[in-house]
From Swiss-Prot:
Molecular function terms, GO-annotated: neutral L-amino acid:sodium symporter activity
Record's keyword terms, sorted: Amino-acid transport, Cell inner membrane, Cell membrane, Membrane, Symport, Transmembrane, Transmembrane helix, Transport
Identification of the protein by name: Serine/threonine transporter SstT
Its biological purpose: Involved in the import of serine and threonine into the cell, with the concomitant import of sodium (symport system).
Lineage: Bacteria, Pseudomonadati, Pseudomonadota, Gammaproteobacteria, Enterobacterales
Cross-referenced HAMAP family: Ser_Thr_transp_SstT
GN (gene name): sstT
Family (UniProt): Belongs to the dicarboxylate/amino acid:cation symporter (DAACS) (TC 2.A.23) family.
The organism of origin for this protein: Salmonella typhi
Amino acid sequence: MATQRASGLLQRLAQGSLVKQILVGLVLGILLAWISKPVAEAVGLLGTLFVGALKAVAPVLVLMLVMASIANHQHGQKTNIRPILFLYLLGTFSAALAAVVFSFAFPSTLHLSSSAQDIVPPSGIVEVLRGLLMSMVSNPIDALLNANYIGILVWAVGLGFALRHGNETTKNLVNDMSNAVTFMVKLVIRFAPVGIFGLVSSTLATTGFSTLWGYAHLLVVLIGCMLLVALVVNPLLVFWKIRRNPYPLVFACLRESGVYAFFTRSSAANIPVNMALCEKLNLDRDTYSVSIPLGATINMAGAAITITVLTLAAVHTLGVPVDLPTALLLSVVASLCACGASGVAGGSLLLIPLACNMFGIPNDIAMQVVAVGFIIGVLQDSCETALNSSTDVLFTAAACQAEDERLANNALRS
């Protein structure tokens, strides 16, 4: 009898609402950090294991899904990569532009007194682009081990096209392997409430939020701009694409992708979550198996906002005059830098000196701005990743749904 009750409880947990379970894990994590910091730090291992499991399965998932979708692609079957790529680039530039407007409307200043950290940023935009190109020709084993998604995509696409000429048995094997990896991903995602419980409790216990109050205004501008993009700019782009109320789709993506990304703080770790959401939304697998890992690499609206806001905060602090053409140029530079953020250790923060260089700000001061970024990173990085990752699914869904409606309308006319 006790065994039956236990199995019934496990079944309810396995089939219950994952979002509700995550909220429970979030509340319990906050309570544990408030009650006992040592215990909260100890259970941080649960969060580390969860993020590690997601990061471990994500490269294999991308390789197998992309390879299987291309190998089994039927001649004449249309994918929607081009409109999604356009949305990614337009969304990133729009975010940078919104950050410029927000920064001028609510100018922030910094206390540039902390010593620059012993880290070396890229010397220019050419180096960032060079890094991206070099990652394309990475060894496939090395790409898998280091989660180099550009390299993984290149090899997956190449192998997929090569396997198109293979036997049907080989194609079926690749497809079965893809399904097996997808099953493993779903299994890992079911442990999200436990992982988020560990992440929240350890983060609050080790960092707290007392150090953030000194940068409250900067954080309000940063997070406010990200909310503006998530709730106004992105919905406008989606409405332009699907021509109907975008908010049900926007909120679904924020709830089921953004929440995970906020706590894991890793676009790579969130790839399996986004893939599962795309499947739930019944999107075209050939499309999302490519667009989601591609989005985790180049769709960086949050990074564009971070680079722009922190750069203009440094500009306002130093009293450097900025005209409209320069502000527009900053939006372009921030967008280009953001697209290369995934290929730089330290992400968007270490690309701030590139943008600061536009205004003649010395590198030692620019690195102090980076140091400020690390201080507020607990919230900045979480919000940035949540915006980046949820937008990957949002734009993929918008493009797929727009294409489905176009095909349906054409069928009705004929």
